[in-house]
Every structure is written in structure tokens, then in C-alpha cells.
């Protein structure tokens, strides 16, 4: 990490947002932990990587395919990634050593509060599933191992009074694998936490002979907040967000963050934060959920972990004060 910081600060010290082109600079590589190819983290991470590579001379950034939030946090904790996408609940667990991070705290700081993640509980017509309680006895994918989806899915199932390991047959599949299994009749429902629309869910909704159905679950927010704090919020996915689902459906939201190691260099984090806000339109062209990257959202408490001082410095310049302790 120290070698990475030293090299990167050297190349960005005098950098504005001009296209990279200096051939005499040693290339510095940045790894951005994202998610699976069928989700939203990966394309947004790819967009961010392209921006860093384009506008910061000497930097070559790469979006890495991962299992998602928990894997990204573990990569940062192991010094194998410099920036990571994560859901706020997974980040909270990591910094406090809870759940999958028991005995393995990760020193993190918030780079930006990015966009809200929408829990999807997805099935198709003919499955016999019309409510959360109908998941009992069914074959259900709760998300890939070491993913934020799995963490939130397990908590949501418990919020409705069910045991995810006893009351259903649980599969641990990525969103792309879950959609494929649902198409093939190998599972009855899937959980997925991501932006709206998520490409894989859109693909399912467009499959001939399949009519998508989103299951209401927003009422689980109260029990989740009682146990885990105000990270989880009741919201709704609007009608026609996916082809064939013509109802508004209640859901659980948890915000997505970009995080960095707590010891990341202030100037590095300042530059990345500045780039994201001042070239936001390029990220929006990659996925519309980047439109949620707003200055006002940074100070709402959506992130349960402090901001990195470098990010806070840029935000202060823009009139926004955030927690750094």
C-alpha cells in the first residue's frame, strides 16, 4: 500500500483533469473492486477506471470482477485493492468486526456516498410465491458467497420470522447465475441488491415465456432497523422499472459507498473525489444510477463510517461538512 501511495501521489501531484499522455511517467496501476458482470458495480467501476486512466497522467486503473461488497472489503483489508464498491451495511460490519468480519476488522474510510441499492426479491408467474412468507419450502438464491446481497438477504429473511437455512433450500449464486437458474426452473426466487434497472433482472424480464414478479418486502425494514440500526430504509421500486412488472413494489434500500483504506494518501483521495464530482456526467452515461452522486447526499448520514480526510477536504471546498471521526 505504501509503495502504491508513493507512486500515485508522484504522478497526480500536478495533475488537473487533462487527458493522460505523458510517456515519461511510470505507469501506476489501481485496482477497483466491483462485483459480477451482471450487476451495476462492474460497469460503474469500469467507467471510473476509464476516467482515472484518462485524466490522471501515468495512472492505469482496472475494474476487477469480484463477488461484491464483502470480497471488495477483504481485498482492501489484504492490501490487494485500492478502491472498493460496497454496501453500507457490509462496510459497517467490516470496520466493527461483525458477522463475516469477526476477528478481522478492516480500517476503511468513505470516499463517496454513491447511489441507493435496491433489494430485489424476484420470482416469476407460476411459482406460487406472492409474499415473503411464501418463500418457505422454496428453492431460493440468496446471492453469491461473500457478497453484500447475501448479508442483506439473510437479515431480511430473518426480519420476516424465517430461518434462511431451515425454512427454504438456499443456493448461493451470483445475480447472473441466479437469473439463469430461475429461467431454467432450478430455483423459485432470487435475492439481489443493486441499482434499478439491473441488467440481469432486465434480461430475465425480457425472456419469452417468463413474466417477472417482484415481491413486496418493505415492511421488513422496521425489524431490520431495530437490530442493525438506521442503515436500512423502506422505499419502493416503481412500476415498469422492469418489463412486465406493472405494480409499484415496496423494498429495502441501503446506500452504496466507494471506500478506501484508512491510511490512503489525502491527496490521492482528494483527486479521485474531485474527479468523480466534476466528471460525473461521464459516469451517468455508463449507468443512470450515477446520477445519485450528489453533494447533498454526502452529509445525510447514509454512510455509517467516517469520510476520508482527503474526500472531506474536497467536500468542504464545495460547502459540505461530513464526519471524519
State each model region's role.
Residues 1-29, 325:
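Short, low-complexity disordered leader/linker segments with a strong preference
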Residues 73, 82-85, 168-230, 312:
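Ligand-binding pocket segment of bilobal, Venus flytrap-like solute-binding proteins
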Residues 46-50, 62-103, 121, 176-181, ...:
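Pocket-flanking alpha-helical
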Residues 206, 211-271, 306-307, 314, ...:
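C-terminal lobe and pocket-closing loops
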Residues 290-302:
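Surface-exposed aromatic
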Residues 102-114, 240-250:
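A structural signal for short loop-to-beta-strand junctions that line the ligand-binding cleft
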Residues 276-293:
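Periplasmic-binding protein-like
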Residues 29-55, 59, 117-184, 301, ...:
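Bilobed "Venus flytrap"/periplasmic-binding protein-like clamshell domains
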Amino acid at each position: 500500500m505504501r509503495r502504491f501511495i508513493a507512486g500515485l501521489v508522484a504522478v497526480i501531484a500536478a495533475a488537473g483533469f487533462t487527458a493522460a499522455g505523458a510517456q515519461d511517467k511510470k505507469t501506476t496501476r489501481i485496482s477497483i473492486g466491483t462485483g459480477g458482470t451482471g450487476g451495476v458495480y462492474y460497469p460503474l467501476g469500469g467507467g471510473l477506471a476509464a476516467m482515472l486512466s484518462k485524466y490522471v497522467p501515468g495512472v492505469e486503473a482496472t475494474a476487477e470482477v469480484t463477488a461484491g461488497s464483502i470480497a471488495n472489503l477483504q481485498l482492501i483489508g489484504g492490501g490487494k485493492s485500492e478502491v472498493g464498491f460496497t454496501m453500507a451495511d457490509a462496510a459497517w460490519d467490516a470496520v466493527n468486526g461483525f458477522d463475516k468480519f469477526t476477528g478481522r476488522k478492516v480500517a476503511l474510510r468513505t470516499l463517496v456516498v454513491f447511489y441507493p441499492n435496491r433489494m430485489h426479491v424476484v420470482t416469476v408467474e407460476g411459482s406460487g410465491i406472492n409474499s415473503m412468507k411464501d418463500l418457505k419450502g422454496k428453492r431460493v438464491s440468496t446471492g453469491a458467497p461473500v457478497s453484500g446481497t447475501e448479508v442483506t438477504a439473510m437479515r431480511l429473511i430473518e426480519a420476516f420470522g424465517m430461518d434462511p437455512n431451515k425454512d427454504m433450500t438456499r443456493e448461493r449464486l451470483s445475480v447472473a447465475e441466479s437469473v439463469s437458474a430461475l429461467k431454467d426452473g432450478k430455483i423459485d426466487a432470487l435475492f439481489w441488491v443493486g441499482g434499478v434497472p439491473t441488467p440481469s433482472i432486465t434480461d430475465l424480464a425480457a425472456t419469452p415465456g417468463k413474466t417477472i414478479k417482484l415481491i413486496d418486502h418493505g415492511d421488513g425494514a422496521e425489524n431490520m432497523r431495530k437490530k442493525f440500526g438506521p442503515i436500512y430504509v423502506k422505499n419502493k421500486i416503481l412500476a415498469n422499472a422492469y418489463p412486465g412488472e406493472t405494480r409499484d413494489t415496496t423494498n429495502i434500500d441501503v446506500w452504496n459507498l466507494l471506500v478506501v483504506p484508512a491510511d490512503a494518501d489525502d491527496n490521492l483521495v482528494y483527486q479521485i473525489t474531485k474527479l468523480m464530482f466534476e466528471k460525473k456526467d461521464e459516469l451517468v452515461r455508463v449507468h443512470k444510477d450515477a446520477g445519485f452522486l450528489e453533494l447533498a447526499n454526502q452529509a445525510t448520514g447514509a454512510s455509517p463510517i467516517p469520510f476520508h480526510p482527503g474526500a472531506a477536504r474536497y467536500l468542504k471546498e464545495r460547502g459540505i461538512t461530513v464526519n471524519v471521526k
